[in-house]
């Protein structure tokens, strides 16, 4: 399987970059890399883990919470997001969904 570099940028501007396989959820890979991210349901059914992707593509088809207008703005649920390219994602974006 392919491996991509994912860079997460936190609310204070802190950056963490790590590798994620294309069949691994970004949240799971972040935890393995020691990055502490917010989450709740781990099933794409809430918005606790929401981030905003500024570069790259993900597959988050297993999620159910986000609507098309969220996708158009780049919102991503890290608990159900598989990377499809190298990505840059701003984390902790739940409050901006509403």
Swiss-Prot record:
One of its GO terms (biological process) is electron transport chain. Binds 1 [2Fe-2S] cluster. Residues 4-95 form the 2Fe-2S ferredoxin-type domain. Keywords: 2Fe-2S, Chloroplast, Electron transport, Iron, Iron-sulfur, Metal-binding, Plastid, Transport. It comes from Raphanus sativus (Radish). The lineage of its organism: Eukaryota, Viridiplantae, Streptophyta, Embryophyta, Tracheophyta. [2Fe-2S] cluster binds at residues 41, 46, 49, 79. It is found in: Plastid, Chloroplast. Its main location: plastid. This is Ferredoxin, root R-B2. In radish there are 4 ferredoxins: 2 are root-specific (R-B1 and R-B2), one is present in both leaves and roots (L-A), and there is a minor form which is leaf specific (L-B). GO terms for cellular component: chloroplast. Ferredoxins are iron-sulfur proteins that transfer electrons in a wide variety of metabolic reactions. Belongs to the 2Fe2S plant-type ferredoxin family. It holds the Pfam family Fer2. Its cofactor is [2Fe-2S] cluster. The keyword Transport applies. One of its GO terms (molecular function) is metal ion binding.
């Amino acid at each position: 399987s392919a491996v991509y570099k994912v860079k997460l940028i936190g609310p204070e501007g802190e950056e963490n970059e790590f590798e994620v396989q294309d069949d691994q959820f970004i949240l799971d890979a972040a935890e393995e890399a020691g990055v502490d991210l917010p989450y709740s349901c781990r099933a794409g059914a809430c918005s606790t883990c929401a981030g905003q992707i500024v570069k790259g593509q993900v597959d988050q088809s297993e999620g159910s919470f986000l609507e098309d207008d969220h996708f158009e703005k780049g919102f991503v649920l890290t608990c159900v997001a598989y990377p499809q390219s190298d990505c840059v994602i701003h984390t902790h974006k739940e409050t901006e969904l509403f």
